[in-house]
UniProtKB/Swiss-Prot annotation:
HAMAP family the record matches: PSII_PsbY
Record key words, sorted: Membrane, Photosynthesis, Photosystem II, Thylakoid, Transmembrane, Transmembrane helix
This protein's name: Photosystem II reaction center protein Y
InterPro entries hit by this protein: PSII_PsbY
Pfam families: PsbY
Upper lineage: Bacteria, Bacillati, Cyanobacteriota, Cyanophyceae, Oscillatoriophycideae
Gene: psbY
Length: 39
């Protein structure tokens, strides 16, 4: 594999995983809030 591919894909993967992590955390928080409001 060419090192240039890693230079381009590496930061994209880091950014994508960071976005998924943040969105996932917010979604879980909202879900818990919604469930606690229901009961």
């Amino acid at each position: 594999m060419d090192w240039r591919v890693l230079v381009v894909v590496g930061p994209l993967l880091i950014a994508a995983s960071w976005a998924v992590f943040n969105i996932g955390a917010a979604a879980i928080r909202q879900l818990q809030e919604f469930r606690s409001r229901e009961s």
